[in-house]
Amino acid sequence: MCTRKYFLSKKATIVAGVDEVGCGSLVGAVVASAVLMLYPDQEQLFSGLIDSKALSNKKRLRFCNYIQKYSLHWSIGMVNVTEIDQLNIFQARLLSIKRAICNLSMIPDLVLIDGKHAPSLNKNILYQCFVKGDSRIPVISAASIIAKVTRDQAMMMLHTQYPKYGFHRNKGYATVFHLKQLDLYGPTIYHRKTFAPVKYMLSMC
């Protein structure tokens, strides 16, 4: 657990939490967010936050506005569909995290990353990975919320271009409805060609 003692041992005054969303989607970018906070503020301001996936859309948006207002800085890192297909989803995830960290306005004393793996970072950047960190560490929860809201908004915009696929609801994930529409109409240019259902569909053309 990421306790007060842990932060003090790292002499971490300014911390950043990082999380990403969209790895399992068939459509669109992988989006990561990094949120920069003073360590004491992380506990005081963000202690009630939970993983973005456990929140309603309304609460998630309200928390997102709150985080953007009270954090020292926040950033986004995106990896687009072309890059995902050129790399793989594992490397795309790491790249989105790296871009989010690099887009921060300053180097934190400590970066807290959700999951088991971290990208290669500047040697001056101290980091620690935490499995299920988005539900254990407030500043990572904050990052997960901003990443989720950012990606959901992008998928809503994509829905206006391609309304047949239900992106406003499924956010590009492989729901029964999405797969049915994919079978009827084929993939869009924003579908990930290397992902199994899309790859299979393209092989049938």
UniProtKB/Swiss-Prot annotation:
**Cofactors, names only:** Mn(2+); Mg(2+)
What residues bind a divalent metal cation, as annotated? D19, E20, D114
Protein's UniProt name: Ribonuclease HII
Q: Which domain of life is it from?
A: Bacteria
| Gene this protein is translated from | rnhB
Q: Which InterPro entries match?
A: RNase_HII, RNase_HII/HIII, RNase_HII/HIII_dom, RNaseH-like_sf, RNaseH_sf
Instruction: Give a yes or no for keyword Endoplasmic reticulum in this entry.
Output: no
So what family is this one in?
A: Belongs to the RNase HII family.
**CDD domains, alphabetically?**
RNase_HII_bacteria_HII_like
In terms of PANTHER family, this protein maps to: RIBONUCLEASE H2 SUBUNIT A, RIBONUCLEASE HII
Q: Which residue ranges does the record assign to the RNase H type-2 domain?
A: 13-205
Q: What is its main location?
A: cytoplasm
What GO cellular component is one of the record's annotations? Answer: ribonuclease H2 complex
Q: How is the cofactor bound?
A: Manganese or magnesium. Binds 1 divalent metal ion per monomer in the absence of substrate. May bind a second metal ion after substrate binding.
Catalyzed reactions = Endonucleolytic cleavage to 5'-phosphomonoester
Q: Where in the cell is it found?
A: Cytoplasm
